[in-house]
């Protein structure tokens, strides 16, 4: 396959940096532009020194300054890690210009802007007007493992919490073994709060600390409900309590439900293994998943437990990779007809 130019919008954030890292190791995508208005002209390596060997003196590009460098009638892999509320309008502008030049663009948006089917649903959760409501029908949103294929050119990646929870919840709801009400605890690392320190999210507050926030009111909850129903066919009530953990990367989610009849851990595990038998990035484990087994990789670990009528499914992912940049790369591989694992086979370091 001829190399495909790849562009990252919002390239100075943590997810943007992970996308740059993954593109650098990809066999078929070549970085054409790392877009950041605030740092245009600065070397990528100034913001991300660890990417210096891959990016060299490559500068960040300003919005609108890079598209002329993409040859007419060529393909384009467009990744957006731009902020919620800004991503949609940026994507719409680029796609309009690309279409005029015959550029065949596929888009994967990691922001929330295209996770909902209609503008009103998005605006109810995130506030403000949607930046490109005319494009909502052109996007599909799903965890890669929960949608076998799509005929759309553009994909919205679910949020990091949503990804971790859906990997556990969707097969559980599909199994028919449990009532359609889920009780969910999720613990996330500090990178999930972005690069800008805030009173409750930066290191001195989180180190040696653990606390819940937005209990039963997190904005990923309606997203989880919607995507779980789409993937499983079951509308479930989701009671979600997120927590801030004292670590940088990773999400550990625990999903509990009540069994509707007699069921064993073995039956549950067999169902999950069948459901994810063709999913190279999902591993069903004995006992509990562990963050160190997945951090810095695109892997997800899932563990299952059962006692009486209580069923528990646990999942662990890297919030920046499987929950964002890696999942986005999975989707982009599929949109371009590449092996799903291309550029994503690096093993987790284990000792971080």
Name the predicted role of every residue range.
Residues 253-352:
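C-terminal active-site/capping subdomain that shapes the small-molecule cofactor and substrate pocket
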Residues 20, 166-173, 221-225, 269, ...:
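Predominant activation on well-ordered alpha-helical scaffold segments within soluble catalytic domains
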Residues 14, 138, 160-167, 215-223, ...:
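Conserved active-site and cofactor/substrate-binding residues in soluble primary-metabolism enzymes
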């Amino acid at each position: 396959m001829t190399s495909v130019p790849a562009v990252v919008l919002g390239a100075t954030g943590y997810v943007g940096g992970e996308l740059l890292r993954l593109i650098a190791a990809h066999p078929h995508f070549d970085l054409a532009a790392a877009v950041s208005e605030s740092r245009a002209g600065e070397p990528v390596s100034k913001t991300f020194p660890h990417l210096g060997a891959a990016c060299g003196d490559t500068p960040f590009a300003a919005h609108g300054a890079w598209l002329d460098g993409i040859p007419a009638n060529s393909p384009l892999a467009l990744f957006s890690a731009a902020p919620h509320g800004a991503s949609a309008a940026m994507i719409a502008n680029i796609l309009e210009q690309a279409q005029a030049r015959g550029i065949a663009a596929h888009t994967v948006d990691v922001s929330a802007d295209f996770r909902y089917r209609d503008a009103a649903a998005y605006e109810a959760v995130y506030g403000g007007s949607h930046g490109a409501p005319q494009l909502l029908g052109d996007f599909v949103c799903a965890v890669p493992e929960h949608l076998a294929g799509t005929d759309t050119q553009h994909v919205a990646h679910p949020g990091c919490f949503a990804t971790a929870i859906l990997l556990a919840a969707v097969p559980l709801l599909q199994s028919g073994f449990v009532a359609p009400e889920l009780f969910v605890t999720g613990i996330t690392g500090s990178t999930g709060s972005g690069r800008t320190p805030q009173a409750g999210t930066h290191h001195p507050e989180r180190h040696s600390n653990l606390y819940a926030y937005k209990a039963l009111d997190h904005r990923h909850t309606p997203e989880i409900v919607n995507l779980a129903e789409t993937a499983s066919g079951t509308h479930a009530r989701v009671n979600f309590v997120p927590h801030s953990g004292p670590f940088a990367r990773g999400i550990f989610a625990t999903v509990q439900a009540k069994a509707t009849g007699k069921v064993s851990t073995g039956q549950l595990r067999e169902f999950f293994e069948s459901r994810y038998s063709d999913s190279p990035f999902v591993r069903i484990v004995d006992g509990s998943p562990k963050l160190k087994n997945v951090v810095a990789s695109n892997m997800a670990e899932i563990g299952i437990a059962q006692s009486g009528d209580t069923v528990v499914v646990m999942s662990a992912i890297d919030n920046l990779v499987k929950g964002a940049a890696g999942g986005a790369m999975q989707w982009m591989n599929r949109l371009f007809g590449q092996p799903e694992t291309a550029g994503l086979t690096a093993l987790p370091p284990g000792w971080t």
